[in-house]
Amino acid sequence: MKKSFIHQQEEISFVKNTFTQYLIAKLDVVEVQGPILSRVGDGMQDNLSGVENPVSVHVLNIPNATFEVVHSLAKWKRHTLARFGFNEGEGLVVNMKALRPDEDSLDQTHSVYVDQWDWEKVIPDGQRNLAYLKETVETIYKVIRLTELAVEARYDIEAVLPKKITFIHTEELVARYPDLTPKERENAITKEFGAVFLIGIGGVLPDGKPHDGRAPDYDDWTSESENGYHGLNGDILVWNEQLGTAFELSSMGIRVDEEALKRQVDITGDQERLQFDWHKSLLNGLFPLTIGGGIGQSRMAMFLLRKKHIGEVQTSVWPQEVRDTYDNIL
């Protein structure tokens, strides 16, 4: 039992360390330290889809402030790039840990505990467009494939990912599968191609509903991308044979500029956010144009090690029935 546990831990560490090294080298980012707490009222917290409640923390020796455990570091990273004067094409990555207690369900792929490579880069002049988004996606996908090949060489786990990732807009997906739900569309397209980047998540589609929810103040999901489609963000999905479903490894996108921010808070009815310090800084042109996202560490390990439950690669909290069902929950 001890031997199996140690081997399990070594596999997880190998995936995380290998991916980190490749990501830093290929994406050309530096690894930095990030916070676990965000001060309430400065606008730095990531509100995700807008309905999740963060964990509140009161610090004894800072009585006049309330803090929250971060959901992600989407806004903090952009603030940090500006604060320390990162140049065009430069960026950072954080070994981010967070809590999301309002997950809809605790299942094979969702946990209260979130660990991800949270990264952000300053966009080179004139490249705030879909082409640059795709180029960055291809770089990250290359890192995923290189890590998979390293796992194959070390642990004899067969590599399954295609050499290329397929790009498709959510608006195209609705037209292609008009009678399917968003999740069913993801399953259909990802099973066909093996690896997909789904472009444009957050805006209302021709069927009157968004593919999925996104907060209005980090990704740009309203700007036109190409051919009348909208959204400069998306998700990297791979086909997970163990689960028989599409499997999200990363959510990322070009971040809002001043116009996209104002447009999107009008759509979502979150105009009050513009009074926060972070949002004022953006509107006053104090932040660089950036691209960024999060890549799930436990999800990456789960996929590359062919595990059936995320609890096999991270230590979290689970209902007893989950522990009774899966022998290798940590």
From Swiss-Prot:
Provide the organism lineage as a comma list.
Answer: Bacteria, Bacillati, Bacillota, Bacilli, Lactobacillales
Q: For this protein, what is the EC number?
A: 6.3.1.1
Q: Which reaction does it catalyse?
A: L-aspartate + NH4(+) + ATP = L-asparagine + AMP + diphosphate + H(+)
- Keyword Amino-acid biosynthesis attributed: yes
CDD domains per the UniProt record, alphabetical: AsnA
Q: Which PANTHER family match?
A: ASPARTATE--AMMONIA LIGASE
Classification via InterPro entries = aa-tRNA-synth_II (IPR006195), aa-tRNA-synth_II/BPL/LPL (IPR045864), AsnA (IPR004618)
Q: Does the keyword Ligase apply?
A: yes
- Record family assignment: Belongs to the class-II aminoacyl-tRNA synthetase family. AsnA subfamily.
Instruction: Identify the GO cellular component terms for this protein.
Output: cytosol
Q: Where in the cell is it found?
A: Cytoplasm
Annotated disulfide bonds:
none
The record lists the organism as: Streptococcus equi subsp. zooepidemicus (strain MGCS10565)
Pfam families the UniProt entry points to? AsnA
Say which domain of life the source belongs to. Answer: Bacteria
Q: Which gene encodes it?
A: asnA
Q: Tell me, what is an example of a GO biological process annotation in this record? A: L-asparagine biosynthetic process
* Gene3D superfamilies linked: Bira Bifunctional Protein, Domain 2
**GO molecular function terms noted in the UniProt entry:** aspartate-ammonia ligase activity; ATP binding; catalytic activity, acting on a protein; transferase activity
Q: What is its main location?
A: cytoplasm
Descriptive protein name? Aspartate--ammonia ligase
